């Protein structure tokens, strides 16, 4: 079947699902490969995998996950070799060809890099080669990191024009309360896309392994949803995976949004960390709703100092109404000067 006639599914597998008692789960990898093989005639598959830092840390006898950038980079560099070799061995046993792809956040702002990455991934899929993707931690900086593979997988979903993003985690899906702390927590099977409803679910949990808790999974669903892509959050089992591929109800299914937003603005909204918060008046809010830039004279209060290029939360009446990138620093504030340009501003 031609690549254009196949649906593309992006599968993100988290560290807590992939690592079993300090080792890569052979059961999961074999089941993943076997079921991809069975569905390869009708679907293209892209894998976004975690696990490199954990595997590298164990190889280097780190007792806990490193916190410094240098140690994270070393652990990732060591672990990435083991990770991709295990994928290659298991997938080759099922006559599947994989390709390692390491990417950085630069591709969001660099049009040429974005186009090149898109072309490379599409060509791999056209040749029935399965891209196995991870962030290039070794060359990334704090400022130029996705920070977690949940949001990376959402960006990849956009690049390959996926029909669905499947997030494999150690929980059955999204819950109305943190199931680790509340025995009455109930799993939510189905969510109509609504950013405010999803935002209400963000403070749920954070896992001990890896960098992505449930908040980043919700952000990934928001990024994907605003690009017309469904997200399904499941715990790993062979049946759950097959059901998700075949469109059956399992875990939590988050539908796509009717509204589409450009990738750069999606990253500003859900991927970029804010360093400051500013309060604005009604006039400024009405102006940005009409597609105008945010001017300094609409700012009522600055909560923290900021520099050019910093992320800023924009607040009206104690509600986060927008987010953007500072065009000037806080000590340059002056009437009628643009604080956040409309191209770097998104209303939430």
Predicted regions and their residues:
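C-terminal catalytic "cap/lid" subdomain
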Residues: 1-62, 68-97, 101-348
